[in-house]
Amino acid sequence: MTKWKRANPNGTRDYLFEECTLIEEVEQKLRLTFLERGYEEIRTPTIEFYDVFAFQNRPIDEEKMYKFFDEKGRIIVLRPDMTIPLARVIGTQRWDTPLKVTYSGNVFRANESHSGKYNEIVQSGIEVIGIDNVRAEIECVISVIQALQKLKVQSFTIEIGQVQLYKCIVKKLSIQDEEERVLRTYIESKNYAALSNFIGEKKLDRCDETVRLLEKLPRLFGNLEVIEEAEKLASSNEMKMAIARVKEMYETIEMLGYGSYISIDLGMIQHLDYYTGVIFKGYIYEIGEEIVSGGRYDELIGNFGEMLPAVGLAVQVNQIVKALQEQQEPYERNQIDIVIHYELNRLAEAERLRNLLRKDGKNAWLSLFSNLSDTFQFARKNKIGTVVEAQNEYLVEYVWNEKWVVQKEGEASCVTFKLR
């Protein structure tokens, strides 16, 4: 029964000290950036009913959910996604739109063992509800670019795709569900040979414009030249409108001076089926994992109530932290300047002295040791050069000079006690 008591479950880990601090700092900077842009905060429970995620098309595989039962025998899950619970909140209440919301929290997915993915991650994100025009997508992309800039993330790119274009191609070529899932993996992985074999096995006419567009799809990534190629092969108004939306987004964001942070990838297809239009993925060159994901999901909220257009994105906080650790100087824990040793009856005076020193910019630390010799040993181990002792009647300052020597003594009150 105690076999696993010293281990973490697969896909989880402990976060310690400076890494924990960095996670909190990243979350807070993202939060403040989004609040400055007019987003309002929403928090949803860590646990949700399984039914929240079990609607048509099952956007999240059942096998990836952590499931258990509540006191009434109902199936509960640890939330595997942040957007779907938010859609539940929006869909089950009446709101004045447009609505801009932000969130942050942990997400849980049971990934395959040895996949290299963590089963518990931290996400911070934004959603724009009730707007169906391209301004909503532009707002999301600009917001996340500014947030990443404030975090001083280097060498990142936000890729813009269009899942509606892919869906139009699949529909026009009458590709069925099972085949579509296979096709999706070929395009996403840019497996040109497998895609060509798929087209051959399906006996699709390679002279047909839509088939040619399908075969080119994994190669359509880069700048506006990609849009021009796609436009030449678009065989329906719906395809042309989908491509035009990406073009309008790209041109507008470029005009605002953020062109170096964006690129186009029409072969990008999100793994979550609830996306209906423009989609986003963000990457940092130093790490292979995505740091941003999202897109438009105009049909999702309708599963819970009124049908409302929406677009949003999530920032993968853990991946941001990983990148910052690689890009920046090693994190240094706050150096303690002074340790205050005290008798218990002098704790109030020691606390007042600590507060006074902190106001003067000193990092003062109350000793947890009852013996002065132990406090001295702690100070030396942590390269702290000053110890103040609050004795029964007065304060004593010690400094390290090859040994601990008295620098000053005699003051009874911390108000009059001044360090050298």
From Swiss-Prot:
Matches recorded under PROSITE patterns: AA_TRNA_LIGASE_II
Cellular location(s): Cytoplasm
Superkingdom of origin: Bacteria
Entries under CDD domains matching the protein: HisRS-like_core
Entry keyword annotation includes Transmembrane helix: no
One of the record's GO molecular function terms: catalytic activity, acting on a protein
Listed SUPFAM superfamilies: Class II aaRS and biotin synthetases
Matches recorded under InterPro entries: aa-tRNA-synth_II (IPR006195), aa-tRNA-synth_II/BPL/LPL (IPR045864), HisRS-like_core (IPR041715), HisRS/HisZ (IPR004516), HisZ (IPR004517)
A Pfam family hit: tRNA-synt_His
GO biological process, alphabetically ordered: histidyl-tRNA aminoacylation; L-histidine biosynthetic process
Pathway listed: Amino-acid biosynthesis; L-histidine biosynthesis; L-histidine from 5-phospho-alpha-D-ribose 1-diphosphate: step 1/9
Keyword Protease: no
NCBIfam families for this protein: hisZ_biosyn_reg (TIGR00443), PRK12292.1-6 (NF008938)
Quaternary data: Heteromultimer composed of HisG and HisZ subunits.
Role this protein plays: Required for the first step of histidine biosynthesis. May allow the feedback regulation of ATP phosphoribosyltransferase activity by histidine.
PANTHER family: ATP PHOSPHORIBOSYLTRANSFERASE REGULATORY SUBUNIT, HISTIDYL-TRNA SYNTHETASE
Entry similarity comment: Belongs to the class-II aminoacyl-tRNA synthetase family. HisZ subfamily.
Protein name according to UniProt: ATP phosphoribosyltransferase regulatory subunit
Species this chain originates from: Bacillus cereus (strain ATCC 14579 / DSM 31 / CCUG 7414 / JCM 2152 / NBRC 15305 / NCIMB 9373 / NCTC 2599 / NRRL B-3711)
Taxonomic path: Bacteria, Bacillati, Bacillota, Bacilli, Bacillales
